Amino acid sequence: MNINQINTKLIKPITPTPQNLKNYHISFLDQHVVKKYIAVVLYYQSAPDNGRLEDSLAETLVHFYPLAGRYIKTDLTVDCSDQGAEFIEAEARGDVRVTDLIGKTDTIHLCPEQYFGLDEGVDDPLLSIQVTRFSCGGATIAVSVSHRVFDVSSLETFLSAWSSASKTGGGVAPVIPSFALASLLPNKDEKFGLDSNKCQGKEQKIAVKRLLFEKRALTRLTSERTSGVRAACAVIAKALIRLDRTTHGKSRDFVVFQPINMRGRTGVPSPKNACGNMSFGSFTRRVSAKEEVGIGELVGLIGDGVRRGIAEYTEILCPDRDGRDVIIHVRNKNIKEVFKSETFVVSFTDWSKFGFYEVDFGWGRPIWSGVGPQRPRGNQTIMMRSKEGDGIEAWVHLNEDDMDLFEQDVEIKLFLS
C-alpha cells in the first residue's frame, strides 16, 4: 500500500493555556511506565473533508492541554506552552479502499512516525494524528499518544471528547478531563523508583497475527461465569506455553501478566474522566513447569490474578496511605517473584472494553478499529472487541521466528483470520 503524506502541521489549543497550568507535573505512575507510544487506528467508510477535524481538535486541546505540550524528562514535567499536537494529512494512492484493509494488521503506514520514547526529546509531540484519505471516500484516523502521559483509558476519553466536538460543532457540553492523578500520586525521587524498562527483554523483529474468536467459539469455550476475553487469553496462553517448551527444549515455570485499569476499583474513587496512567500490572501465581494446566485452569488462573491485583492496589488513593509506597511494595514483590529464576511471562492487554467503535466524528461510527504498531520485548497480545460486539479479536505480537511456529499450532489454526 502506497501512502503519501501531503501535509504536516501543529494544531494548538484554540485559546492559550493559562499561566497557572503551564507546568504539568507527571504522576508517580507516569514516571515509571515503559517508554513507548500507544496507537489506535479507526476505519471509516465515508469521511467527508469538512474542516471540522482540525477545528474541533483545537477546541478539544483547550481541555487536554498537556497533549499540546512537550515532556521535559529532567524535570518530570510537561511544558504546556501550546507547542501543538502533530496533525498529518495523507492520501492512499491507487484503488485501495478502506474496506480492503479490514482484518489486516500492517498499520504502520497509516500511523504517524513512532517516536517510541527512546530519547523523549523536548521537541517530540506527545500527541500525533494521521488522517489518511482514500479514493473511495473513506478514511482512517490513527491517533498516537505518549504513554508517559496517557494510558489507553485516557486515550478513549480524549477520542470521545474530540469526536463529540467534531460531530456537534461544539453544541454540547465538552468532555472535561481531570488531571488530578498527578497530585494524588506525585512523582518521587528516582532513587526510590522503579524502572519498568529494565524489566523488558531485548528488542526483536516483531510479527503480528490477528486471531478472531467469534461468538460461537466463545460460547463453546466459556461458561456463564467465564468472560470471553479470559477464555480467548487462555487458548493463546496455552499455545504460547507449548511454543516456549518447543523453543527451549523443556518446560519452564510461567506467569501470566495483564495490566488492570484501576479506575472505579479503588477504595477512594479516582476523579471522573481521570487522565494519566492508572493501570497496574497483575500477575498470576507462578505455575511450576511440572504442573499440567488445561484451558479451564488457565481461565481460573487469569481471573485470580486480576482479582489479586485489584486487592493489592485498592488503597493507593486512601488519604492515610502513601499510594506510592503501595505501588513500590507490590511491584518489587512481583518482579522478585517473576525474575528470581528462569520464568516464561505470557503478556496480555485488554482493550476490548474501550469504546473505539463509538467514536463518531459526524460521518458515522468506524467500520473497524485496529492496533497501531507495537515494539514489545517479548510476547504481547492485545485483545480488541469485534465490530459486531460479541466476538474478540486478539492481536498477537511475537518475534518472527516464534510466529512461524505459533501459526502451526493446531488450536491456533482454528482462529487465524
Swiss-Prot record:
UniProt-listed Enzyme Commission number(s): 2.3.1.214
UniProt keyword terms in alphabetical order: Acyltransferase, Transferase
Pathway: Pigment biosynthesis; anthocyanin biosynthesis
Catalytic residues, chain numbering: 147, 360
Pfam families, per database record: Transferase
Expression across tissues: Expressed at higher level in recently opened, fully pigmented flowers.
GO MF annotation list: acyltransferase activity, transferring groups other than amino-acyl groups; anthocyanin 5-O-glucoside-4'''-O-malonyltransferase activity
Keyword Acyltransferase: yes
Family matches, as Gene3D superfamilies: Chloramphenicol acetyltransferase-like domain
A GO biological process held by the record: anthocyanin-containing compound biosynthetic process
Reaction(s) this enzyme catalyzes, per UniProt: 4'''-demalonylsalvianin + malonyl-CoA = salvianin + CoA
Activity control note: Inhibited by the following metal ions: Cd(2+), Cu(2+), Fe(2+), Hg(2+) and Zn(2+). Activity is strongly inhibited by CoA-SH and partially inhibited by acetyl-CoA, caffeic acid and bisdemalonylsalvianin.
Role played: Catalyzes the transfer of the malonyl group from malonyl-CoA to the 4'''-hydroxyl group of the 5-glucosyl moiety of anthocyanins. Anthocyanins are ubiquitous colored pigments that are responsible for petal color.
PANTHER family referenced in this protein's UniProt entry, alphabetically: F21J9.9 (PTHR31623), TRANSFERASE, CHLORAMPHENICOL ACETYLTRANSFERASE-LIKE DOMAIN PROTEIN (PTHR31623:SF70)
Subunit structure: Monomer.
The family this protein is said to belong to: Belongs to the plant acyltransferase family.
Record protein name field: Pelargonidin 3-O-(6-caffeoylglucoside) 5-O-(6-O-malonylglucoside) 4'''-malonyltransferase
Organism name: Salvia splendens (Scarlet sage)
